[in-house]
UniProtKB/Swiss-Prot annotation:
Main location: cytoplasm
GO molecular function: mRNA 5'-UTR binding
Oligomeric and partner information: Homodimer; the beta-strands of each monomer intercalate to form a hydrophobic core, while the alpha-helices form wings that extend away from the core.
GO terms under cellular component: cytosol
Species classification: Bacteria, Pseudomonadati, Pseudomonadota, Gammaproteobacteria, Pasteurellales
Keyword annotations of the record: Activator, Cytoplasm, Repressor, RNA-binding, Translation regulation
Domain of life, source organism: Bacteria
Glycoprotein in keyword set: no
Protein name: Translational regulator CsrA
Gene3D superfamilies: Translational regulator CsrA (2.60.40.4380)
Subcellular localization: Cytoplasm
Pfam families: CsrA
Length: 64
């Protein structure tokens, strides 16, 4: 795992077209801005896990 330190207003790039910017830090909460093309899905981890679980359920239902 790559670990980076960024200050408010600083960014990091993922590939050529995804930019993550630190917008604010308050206590133990960090607010991030994500600038990515529409074809790139961006989700919080817990939402992604729900989407994946629903897709897995649908896939298993169609195989039965």
């Amino acid at each position: 795992m790559l670990i980076l330190t960024r200050k408010i207003g600083e960014s990091l790039l993922i590939g050529d077209n995804v930019e993550i910017t630190v917008l604010s830090v308050r206590g133990n909460q960090v607010k991030l801005g994500v600038n990515a093309p529409k074809e790139v899905s961006v989700h919080r981890e817990e939402i992604y896990q729900r989407i994946k679980a629903l897709a897995d359920d649908v896939a298993s239902d169609t195989q039965q």
